[in-house]
UniProtKB/Swiss-Prot annotation:
Function: RNA-free RNase P that catalyzes the removal of the 5'-leader sequence from pre-tRNA to produce the mature 5'-terminus.
UniProt-listed Enzyme Commission number(s): 3.1.26.5
Pfam families membership: PIN_5
Record flagged with keyword Hydrolase: yes
Keywords attached to this entry: Endonuclease, Hydrolase, Nuclease, tRNA processing
CDD domains: PIN_VapC-like
Spans traversing the lipid bilayer: none
Record family assignment: Belongs to the HARP family.
Superkingdom field: Archaea
Lineage: Archaea, Thermoproteota, Thermoprotei, Desulfurococcales, Pyrodictiaceae
Protein name according to UniProt: RNA-free ribonuclease P
């Protein structure tokens, strides 16, 4: 039974958006552009699906998010559709999936703690803005200088607020759909998002990052080719 589960885990995968947008994919696939990387990714998935029956899923919400990102970053419609043709788009059955109450409780506690940290970050930057206002009074500084100072404070606020409230935490419907779908189909979640993977693993879902996923697929393809050669040699000598 354990062997059968392992075999299933090796051939069922659910992708989140980062599985297609990870900046390391270009070098791993030997591509000079994102468009070329998507085309090579499509060829790789197609090959292992044909050779091993590997199943690759993606929720509709993730599909739309990935599509918007890729098409706005130089990927052609043809390349994206070539990739999407080998991915099964399936929504999770949200009304049937059960999540343990302890996990929901831990998640709510983390949200509360992060909101408190975010509030402290906001308060700190309000104080900085107030102090800067005294240093850059209208009669002693140009409008451009005040704008630059305020812009620097706002950028710092955004960066630190994002770090305090979102980094390392599941924070979108798209990510949640990917986790739920992986739980439903009993597959491996492919994501480079620390928070998404942590939430998935709390539910017992195995997760790997995109480079590992590429490595697994390439390994399967190499095994398929060497196995095919071995079978041909055995047949010729018999």
């Amino acid at each position: 039974m354990a062997e059968a589960r392992l075999q299933r885990l090796l051939r069922v995968y659910v992708l989140d958006t980062s599985a297609l947008t990870d900046t390391r994919l270009r070098s791993l696939l030997g591509s000079g552009s994102l468009d070329e990387a998507v085309r090579r990714f499509a060829e790789l998935i197609a090959s292992v699906r044909i050779a091993y029956g590997v199943e690759v899923y993606m929720p509709p919400t993730v599909y739309e998010e990935a599509r918007r990102f890729l098409l706005s970053n130089g990927v052609t419609v043809q390349s994206f559709e070539a990739l999407a043709a080998w991915i099964t788009i399936k929504p999770p059955t949200r009304h049937e999936i059960r999540i343990p109450a302890s996990i929901v409780r831990d998640y709510v506690e983390e949200v509360r703690a992060r909101l408190a940290r975010g509030l402290r970050v906001a308060e700190e930057h309000v104080r900085r803005a107030f102090e800067a206002g005294g240093l850059y009074a209208a009669e002693t500084a140009s409008r451009e200088a005040r704008r630059e100072k305020l812009g620097a404070i706002i950028r710092g606020l955004r960066e630190r607020y994002r770090e305090a409230t979102r980094h390392g935490m599941l924070d979108s419907v798209e990510d949640l759909d990917a986790v739920l779908l992986a739980l439903e189909v009993r597959g491996v979640l492919v994501s480079n998002d620390e928070g998404v993977r942590r939430f998935a693993e709390a539910l017992g879902v195995i997760s790997i990052d995109p480079p590992k996923f590429i490595s697994v697929l390439q390994g399967l393809l190499r095994h398929s080719k060497t196995g095919g050669v071995a079978r041909e040699e055995a047949h010729s000598t018999s």
